[in-house]
């Protein structure tokens, strides 16, 4: 069979490059379009070059030789991408036409809506224009969820301080304030007290002015205020060590939802995720309720052909509360870990759906559990405040070393990999915690409880050597 050609809009996020490009190139010819060259790391650029039959970079972002250099690491691109949505759509269509591509995909949430419009214009399978807009604007997303038959929650659009005051009066506290257009929990804030609510709103509103997003990202209001979803851990888990929410990965094919795998989580730092354990140890009844909620949510958004990453709060009486869903792959190493545990390559599966629809080899339900658990974990400065190695009052520090001591792993849990920020790395604690991962590690074991306990022990006992000054 002749290999089909797929256009990849290359940028940050989703399935990590170290898996995506090799997996995709095994079955498909890849053309990579890079709309934001400054958002591509050196290692990402090398993989793009290695596995693509052609690479197209937006010429407007090259003014000097320095612009051809790629950073070693990047979490969020802070340079301006000032092209309006229609211009981005035109560029995608132009590159797609040039190579007569059979499908278009991206791992970056910020380009989902322009990509959907390009797919429609070209007659290619995609998420769907209205569905992509629903999924990218959290106000529209919540409205779609509330219509879809999942748990309905109070919410209000917020643009101004007056809007926020009105939301406080209607919803009360605790209240969640979310930017409608970002990802990775950036800017998500829990408002607990009426007395400090306005100050919190002003702080977040001011901080978000420093978070650059492409001009093509559009929204009707910059914030959504939502009723807080209260978790009820003991109604779902029989043992400690996990969190009161999960994520479920799935695939939409011709408007139908196909669940793939559920990830358990370890307790968060605020709204910053700390670890994902694949697969979930929840019982069959719990998994069924989660799948039902995810199906209603993603089909309720109107999604047609795409990957889905859906986050669900585990509430009282086993009610599944929809946090949000995105028409893209999960980040971190969640997609590679599905392949490690189950042998299913979701990168290839998505491209199969985009090229062949329901002729793809779609799962008949959640993948069956293998006798293996894999955990994808990060350490943050807050962990070292909690274990006493950083004073609470520190606002910045310089890393000298981070180490995991011997004897902290439980059962047959193995430390598969560990990486830490280089000596000399400066860390600014005034940033949202999500920006400040300072170490990452992967664990593998035959017992999920042992893996979860090993994560906890590492969080409590990892050794940080750092330089800092305390305010007088």
From Swiss-Prot:
Enzyme class: ligase
Keywords: Antibiotic biosynthesis, ATP-binding, Ligase, Magnesium, Metal-binding, Nucleotide-binding
Pathway annotation: Antibiotic biosynthesis; bacilysin biosynthesis
Residues at which substrate binds: 273, 309-311, 328-331
Reaction(s) the record says it catalyses: L-anticapsin + L-alanine + ATP = bacilysin + ADP + phosphate + H(+)
Domain of life of the organism encoding this protein: Bacteria
PROSITE patterns: ATP_GRASP
Cofactor: Mg(2+)
List of residues binding Mg(2+) 1: 109, 182, 324
Paired cysteines (S-S): none
Function, as annotated: Part of the bacABCDEFG operon responsible for the biosynthesis of bacilysin, an irreversible inactivator of the glutaminase domain of glucosamine synthetase. Catalyzes the formation of alpha-dipeptides from various L-amino acids in the presence of ATP. In vivo catalyzes the ligation of L-alanine and L-anticapsin (epoxycyclohexanonyl-Ala) to produce the final bacilysin antibiotic (L-Ala-L-4S-cyclohexenonyl-Ala dipeptide).
Protein's name in the database: Alanine--anticapsin ligase
Phylogenetic classification of the source organism: Bacteria, Bacillati, Bacillota, Bacilli, Bacillales
